[in-house]
Curated annotation (Swiss-Prot):
GO molecular function: ADP binding; ATP binding; phosphotransferase activity, phosphate group as acceptor; protein serine/threonine kinase activity; ubiquitin-like modifier activating enzyme activity
Family affiliation: Belongs to the pyruvate, phosphate/water dikinase regulatory protein family. PDRP subfamily.
SUPFAM superfamilies, sorted: Activating enzymes of the ubiquitin-like proteins
Top enzyme category: transferase
Domain of life per record: Bacteria
Native species: Wolbachia sp. subsp. Brugia malayi (strain TRS)
Protein name: Putative pyruvate, phosphate dikinase regulatory protein
């Protein structure tokens, strides 16, 4: 089955809990869609919307869809008008419901209501996932890794931590474990048997470039081994061998954004 790719832009003036939940429910009805979700939270100004539209425009040759839960009429109209101008499909979730209630009861909505106060079970689950992921970053606290939903393994600078945090915000408990080529893998792989374990890999030249930039940023250019092309190539090769030996899905992050990598991981998770 050929999957159609959809960039789904979820725009909210609060944390984004509502729009994420609605989008998640809707997407369950489409198995043939490969979705990359971009969550734009706490959008309060037109300038923020301009930046969102600028990012969407960069992918104008792809399928983009905007869903919003902005309650401010003026701001919501600004987003809608610009989406129409750019021919981007747009749907507001809450406005239609609020308008119908307002019309039926002949009352105006409370402009002072703040969606930041909306707290539900999903919110607390997300907080729990974020706390778990923070405490299981970079191989920490592996004694209770069995409580994770997803495990990421990869060499240094393959976006393990930011990907983990993005997934945590979506409600997944994620642990990430570093792979160091010169050191034997220290973890009992039997513990990963029933868990979704993903191997992250990357192009050698790209990783060398990233590591060199990292060394420059911390004023440690003298550490030539960390970014040595031959060493990096060997490290990636060993990591990929481990992934294949254990039949773990491998994702090449070279030309992918955090959102795209996360979308692929979520697809693997949903197949389990």
């Amino acid at each position: 089955m050929t999957l159609k790719k959809l960039n789904l832009h979820l725009v909210s003036d609060s944390s984004g809990e509502t729009v994420i939940s609605v989008a998640k429910s809707a997407l369950k009805h489409f198995r043939s869609i490969e979705t990359v979700e971009y969550v734009w939270s706490f959008v309060k100004e037109e300038e923020q919307i301009d930046k969102i539209l600028e990012e969407i425009n960069k992918k104008s040759n792809e399928h983009n869809f905007v869903i919003c839960t902005i309650t401010n009429d003026k701001l919501r109209k600004y987003l809608k008008d610009n989406c129409v101008k750019l021919k981007i499909p747009y749907r507001a979730i809450l406005s239609h419901i609020m308008r119908e209630i307002s019309s039926y009861l002949e009352i105006e909505k409370d402009e002072k209501f703040d969606l930041h106060t909306e707290i539900n079970n999903e919110y607390f689950q997300r907080i729990e996932a974020i706390n778990y992921t923070i405490n299981h970053d970079d191989g920490q606290n592996i004694q209770d890794i069995d409580k994770s939903d997803i495990i990421l393994i990869g060499v240094s600078r393959t976006s393990k931590s930011p990907t983990s945090m993005y997934l945590a915000y979506r409600g997944y408990k994620v642990a990430n474990i570093p792979f160091v080529g010169e050191i034997p893998f220290y973890f009992d792989l039997a513990k990963l048997k029933d868990k979704l374990t993903i191997g992250l890999t990357i192009d050698v030249n790209r990783l060398v470039e990233i590591r060199k930039n990292r060394l420059t940023s911390i004023n440690n250019e003298d550490n030539s081994i960390y970014a040595d092309p031959k060493k990096v190539e060997k490290e990636i090769k060993k990591a990929e061998e481990l992934f294949k030996q254990n039949n773990w899905p491998i994702i090449d992050v070279t030309q992918k954004s955090i959102e795209e990598v996360s979308a692929t991981i979520i697809q693997y998770f949903n197949r389990m």
